[in-house]
Amino acid sequence: MSIATTFGTANTSGTIKAMLLGCGELGKEVAIELQRYGIEVIGVDRYPNAPAMQIAHRFHVINMLDAKALKAVIELEKPDLVIPEIEAIATQTLVELEQQGLHVVPTANAAKLTMDREGIRRLAAETLAIPTSKYFFCDTLAEFEQAVTDIGIPCVVKPVMSSSGKGQSVIKSTQTIQQAWAYAQEGGRAGKGRVIVEAFIPFDYEITLLTISAVNGIHFCDPIGHRQEDGDYRESWQPQSMSAEVLHKAQAMSQRVVEALGGYGLFGVELFIRGDEVYFSEVSPRPHDTGLVTLISQDLSEFALHVRAILGLPISNIVQHGPSASAVILAEGTSTNIRYQGMAAALAPADTQLRLFGKPDIDGRRRLGVALARDNSVEQAVEKAKTVASHIKVLF
């Protein structure tokens, strides 16, 4: 990959242009960090006024699964960097354009492999022989029912391509098998299709290990613990307490996956921990939602680290500020005029912060912001973050 040695100014002929494919809350923070280096940011997403579009220099609204539309917008803008921030992208187009010289972050192959759960699971389990849960991929209800029989109950069901827990469920009895299939078909980002059935690992806890591949080597953030509900994270905290031996195993496993994917950038590696055993779950070649806690827990957030790495800049050290937590601000309703109250009360306690994402609308349940807190212990930080979040009243 080519590394920039000269940085220009946005909206001038000498600028470095970065195109964000996906303009949600994570993309918004990446855009902010890019602009700190004078990078010209072009946002692309499937709906207008997405969070990162609100601060990008300009934006385009397209269906990013449409290969023709994706190629057209890239050829129009001629970006120096293309930064996928979501999975639902025509990644084969990125692979083809990369072969013609386009710089995709971290690589087009990484984006393609992690676009769905099948590519990355087969890489980890079959190519790298990394421990994972037992799994089957299914295209039909008959295959699905056979997979559930072979794996046993309880088992976990997910669309091969989805995000934020959409379409995910745990089968706990034979009565819910068809319901789980139907829910997975509804929740896929690219519509109905293939699902993965996984054995349920009775893990002690799960972590996100933010792993950065930079010009000066591999770097790790302290492990992040998190609590899931309905397949989506509700709170995350850093550091997650774990033994030095298990942490070393987790880091070694994460490094193998990241190096196999290639390129520079930050990767969110999800792992299950049971006793002294570590199991690979998933990886995203970009900042991770549970890593929002790093906005308050570290001197360099996951977004700052991602941008440093993709620009070819070195990472010298990462300072962790102590027990920290995030708690999501979740709302349910229908509105195109979302407003908020309770900000003053929310931010009254010491060592607290708030991020409202700027989502333009809501139709159902949606994550609209995140509360951040530091305290003397992880447990106290989690409770403080939850209290901060509880003060925010969403008006529709």
UniProtKB/Swiss-Prot annotation:
It catalyses: N(1)-(5-phospho-beta-D-ribosyl)glycinamide + formate + ATP = N(2)-formyl-N(1)-(5-phospho-beta-D-ribosyl)glycinamide + ADP + phosphate + H(+). It comes from the Bacteria. The lineage of its organism: Bacteria, Pseudomonadati, Pseudomonadota, Gammaproteobacteria, Alteromonadales. Belongs to the PurK/PurT family. The gene is purT. The keyword Magnesium applies. Keywords: ATP-binding, Ligase, Magnesium, Metal-binding, Nucleotide-binding, Purine biosynthesis. PANTHER family: FORMATE-DEPENDENT PHOSPHORIBOSYLGLYCINAMIDE FORMYLTRANSFERASE. It comes from Shewanella frigidimarina (strain NCIMB 400). Involved in the de novo purine biosynthesis. Catalyzes the transfer of formate to 5-phospho-ribosyl-glycinamide (GAR), producing 5-phospho-ribosyl-N-formylglycinamide (FGAR). Formate is provided by PurU via hydrolysis of 10-formyl-tetrahydrofolate. Transmembrane segments: none annotated. Its EC number is 6.3.1.21. Homodimer. Residues 122-311 form the ATP-grasp domain. This is Formate-dependent phosphoribosylglycinamide formyltransferase.
